[in-house]
A protein has these predicted regions:
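A structural signal for small-residue-enriched, beta-sheet-centric alpha/beta enzyme cores
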Residues: 1-79, 83-93, 104-395
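Generic structural marker for isolated residues within well-ordered, non-membrane alpha-helices
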Residues: 99
Length: 395
């Protein structure tokens, strides 16, 4: 019997983890809010991470991947306001310095520290200010919320989540913080996430579990189809619960946390007014289902229709048709929640006002059944509003 219960504490919910934040004015020299944060395991830990698939990788991504090889990382240093991306050799040096300064603060070796940055691309990191910010960090068991707030950029709220799991083998906890609101597309984008657990998990298993869970959460979200240079998801495990759970229990707990954080990111998308789950079923295979679902979710015309509360199914079927998957437009069905828009490729007889009422909701589901095979895939996405355009006009 497995009992999973939501709890407070974010990354500090798991035993032996502390976090903290400080402000140093990274973006413009003015200390308006916290913009440096740290998550730290007070005991030895194992680690796993996944990074952006963008071929243009930021310096912190490269340094973290290098430090991850040892698999014994205990701390993550994070900053907002500057991505440290496309900054050349100096950027790599700065990322290493951030790890070294953090290691000095916490009594670690530099390679025990991973580094994450988010913010503007192509701007040198103001290391004099960053050094002061790191020196001012005072991690505590109550620091998760401040840490989550410090890594926000265009986010409108801090994102944290944690669960406690009770099993026949004992109890353990999993928690996390995340940021992200724009440049969100499958394979992660402009999103950072740090996860912690006090479960005792061997490192090879930890890495496999993180990869699997990310595939079913953060890689299922898309807001604007753009992919960042800085995506990072990190999982630290210190085993302090003395519980070595069955993998089914750990998988369920990890998935609850990653999926909750992923949904928060989509809900907080720039200018978002609607959260939409898009599921394609009956595709020739899962790969084609994914292609079709992502085509619908990233279609500008579809997203604009959602913004206006318009159940325009023609744009949905059009997106499926141009994305390259097998489709028979004489058999496809489309549903908004459980109301049929299309049956066998033609308009269903559902009253328009009922369909419009669903499309006007803050959250609804679009299902497309291609009736060609057993392939299925879902993604979480949003509408596209004038506010999104305003937020991305530039400075």
């Amino acid at each position: 019997m497995i009992e999973i219960k939501k709890m407070k504490g974010g990354v500090c919910a798991a035993r032996g983890f502390v976090a903290g934040a400080s402000g140093c004015g990274i973006k413009n020299g003015k200390v308006m809010r916290d913009d440096v944060a740290v998550v730290f395991s007070e005991s030895p830990a194992t680690s796993a991470a996944t990074f952006t698939t963008n071929k243009v990788k930021a310096a912190p991504v490269r340094i973290s991947a290098e430090h991850l090889k040892a698999g014994a990382n205990r701390a993550v240093i994070l900053n907002s306001g500057n991505a440290n991306a496309c900054t050349g050799e100096n950027g790599l040096k700065d990322a290493r310095t951030m790890c070294a300064d953090t290691a000095g603060l916490l009594g670690l070796k530099p390679k025990e520290v991973l580094v994450c940055s988010t913010g503007r691309i192509g701007v040198p990191m103001p290391m004099d200010r960053v050094a002061k910010g790191i020196a001012a960090l005072k991690p505590s068991r109550n620091g998760s919320a401040a840490c989550a707030a410090a890594i926000m950029t265009s986010d409108t709220f801090a994102k944290e989540y944690a669960v406690e799991v009770k099993t026949s083998k004992g109890s353990f906890r999993v928690g996390g913080i995340a940021k992200g609101a724009g440049m969100i597309d499958p394979n992660m984008a402009t999103m950072l996430c740090v996860l912690t657990t006090d479960a005792a998990i061997p490192q090879p298993t930890l890495r496999a579990e993180l990869k699997r869970s990310v595939a079913n959460s953060f890689n299922r979200i898309t807001i604007d189809g753009d992919m960042s240079t800085n995506d990072t998801v990190i999982l630290l495990a210190n085993g302090l619960s003395a519980c070595s759970p069955d993998m089914s229990a750990f998988s369920q707990a990890l998935d609850e946390v990653t999926r909750a954080l992923a949904r928060m990111i989509v809900s907080d998308g720039e200018g978002v007014s609607r959260f939409v789950e898009v599921e394609v079923t009956g595709a020739a295979n899962d790969k084609e289902a994914r292609t079709a679902a992502e085509a619908i979710a990233n279609s500008t015309l579809v997203k604009c229709a959602w913004s206006g509360g318009d159940p325009n199914w023609g744009r949905i079927l059009d997106a499926v048709g141009y994305c390259g998957v097998k489709v028979d437009d004489t058999t496809a069905d489309i549903f908004y929640d459980k109301l049929a828009l299309v049956k066998n490729g033609i308009a269903a007889q559902t009253p328009f006002e009922k369909l419009r009422a669903v499309a006007a909701k803050k959250s609804f589901k679009v299902t497309v059944d291609l009736k060609l095979g057993n392939g299925s895939y879902y993604v979480w996405t949003t509408d596209l509003t004038e506010e999104y355009v305003r937020l991305n006009l530039g400075e």
